[in-house]
Amino acid sequence: MSTNSRSNSRANFNNEIHDIGTAQNSSMPPTYYDRSLADIFPPHLLKKVVSEVVSTFLLVFVTCGAAGIYGSDKDRISQLGQSVAGGLIVTVMIYAVGHISGAHMNPAVTLAFAVFRHFPWIQVPFYWAAQFTGSICASFVLKAVLHPIAVLGTTTPTGPHWHSLVIEIIVTFNMMFVTLAVATDTRAVGELAGLAVGSAVCITSIFAGAVSGGSMNPARTLGPALASNLYTGLWIYFLGPVLGTLSGAWTYTYIRFEEAPSHKDMSQKLSSFKLRRLQSQSVAVDDDELDHIQV
């Protein structure tokens, strides 16, 4: 294409954009008007929501069930056993539903993914509702099957509240740092994502459990608190995980190597598991999309 013809094409393209914008009385790019309701609420959103309900239910059922039994009889389940159970259920759920919903199971994780543009904001309330629903249902099922155990794996501070807050921030930072690496970076080993995140949860909860309970998850705390009618230091387990996930995601985003890999490297590094998990995250439209249109 000659220089003159390219210039004319670009001018025509700009005129078309201007005409559309004038007709709609807005400077908003037409891309946003062309988006259908299905783009915002995809047909598979219900399946993703159900996936989050089920996975969060099982997460809370296993972790809080183990903690509840440990609290009533330390000879049946050890502190280490609780941590291993929590790490294993996270690993299993990531492999089971990671390709469907991303296996967030945690409102703070969903928030961090949305803030750093790995998840659409419009779907955040649906994920939060699913996660809290799964947690609350699991907690009341535990209340029924573990009766007369009254405290069902609630997370409460064992010392000053600020000690537990700092612990929750640090352990959740660790979990989110690892999660963002294995879930979004094509250079990370995707097939080991479940093991990496599950191990991070297990390792940090071994020592955090003795101080704060090692929640790392507002949903995991709220359900048992409601079922046990115990709300001591509840704010810690909302503020701490949110600060931890946001700081962990920001840190990995900052140090992430941004140079675009070659097609050959991409095919070698991007595992089938990671590809399916990334495809489950409907990434929001890039604000600079028009800059990449070829004319």
From Swiss-Prot:
Alphabetized UniProt keyword annotations: Membrane, Repeat, Transmembrane, Transmembrane helix, Transport
Extent of motif NPA 2: 217-219
Segments passing through the bilayer: 49-69, 83-103, 124-146, 164-184, 192-212, 230-250
Disulfide bond entries: none
Domain of life, source organism: Eukaryota
Extent of motif NPA 1: 106-108
InterPro entries with a match to the protein in the record: Aquaporin-like, Aquaporin_transptr, MIP, MIP_CS
GO cellular component: membrane
Topological category with respect to the lipid bilayer: Multi-pass membrane protein
Chief location: membrane
Compartments it resides in: Membrane
GO molecular function: channel activity
One GO term of the biological process aspect: urea transport
Function, as annotated: Aquaporins facilitate the transport of water and small neutral solutes across cell membranes.
PANTHER family for the chain: AQUAPORIN NIP2-1
Domains (record comment): Aquaporins contain two tandem repeats each containing three membrane-spanning domains and a pore-forming loop with the signature motif Asn-Pro-Ala (NPA).
Family: Belongs to the MIP/aquaporin (TC 1.A.8) family. NIP (TC 1.A.8.12) subfamily.
Protein name: Aquaporin NIP2-1
Species of the source: Zea mays
